[in-house]
Design a protein with these regions (language model features):
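N-terminal targeting signals for export/organelle localization
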Residues: 1-65
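Hydrophobic beta-strand positions
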Residues: 67-68, 188
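Short active-site neighborhood of thiol/selenol oxidoreductases, capturing the structured segment around
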Residues: 76-106
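Conserved helix-turn-beta segment immediately C-terminal to the redox Cys motif
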Residues: 84-85, 102-125
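Short, internal strand/loop/helix patches
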Residues: 124, 139-183
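Thiol-/selenol-based redox modules, centered on thioredoxin-like
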Residues: 175-206
Length: 206
């Protein structure tokens, strides 16, 4: 039996939010929140979905550094964010399907931490569309989805972005018609700059 994609996505969202929150806050509150999201996900689906979602522990290596430009045309270097936990995701600047949902989860997860804990977390999105790389495009996407002042949406030249994709094993494919398919990945980087946890859901199609 096939279930609507919207229902499948809701289940994926719930599990992704759970994982991110538990990683960022190892408290009893976090465990309670984990239980809440898990129960909500169970209510959203009555059969297993076909898409895989998992959080995979990393080997703790230093996250590859990079310098890109944010939605305000300011240069951002990953290594300058040391001292705060980084939630790094790859977002297509033209995407209207899964990417907005990923952004919502990033925002909601951070908001639920409370002001003190949230001040120690930085949300970073790297443009997953090497054909739509202007600052205006990542700014417009951020405005459209209520994220303008909630994260840094980073972009650069196609060559710069391809270098980041390669460093983070992010698969990005552009068809002859311009359709972009990329891994919907989220990475947790600890305050010392080391990779801690990796999440991957279904591929995102713009």
């Amino acid at each position: 039996m096939q279930y609507p994609k919207s229902m499948q996505k809701l289940a994926l969202i719930a599990f992704l939010a759970t994982s991110v929150l538990v990683v960022m806050i190892g408290t009893a509150w976090g465990v309670r929140l984990f239980t809440m999201y898990r129960n909500q996900a169970a209510q959203q689906q009555t059969a297993p979905v076909n898409y895989a979602l998992g959080g995979f522990p990393m080997n703790g290596k230093l996250a590859p550094d990079f310098r890109l430009t944010d939605q305000f045309a300011q240069s951002v270097t990953l290594s300058t964010l040391r001292g705060r936990e980084v939630v790094l995701a790859f977002i297509d600047s033209q995407c209207k399907s899964l990417c907005p949902l990923t952004a919502t989860i990033m925002y909601t997860a951070k908001a639920r931490l409370g002001s003190t804990a949230a001040s120690k977390v930085v949300l970073i999105a790297v443009n997953a569309n090497p054909t739509a790389t202007s600052v205006a495009e990542v700014q417009a996407w951020s405005i459209s989805h209520g994220m303008l002042h909630q994260w840094s949406f980073l972009t650069g030249t196609a060559q710069q972005l391809q270098s980041v994709y390669h460093s983070y094993n992010e698969l990005v494919q552009v068809s002859s018609s311009g359709l972009v398919v990329h891994d919907s990945a989220m990475l947790i980087i600890d305050p010392t700059g080391h990779e801690q946890l990796y999440f991957e859901t279904l591929d995102s199609i713009a």
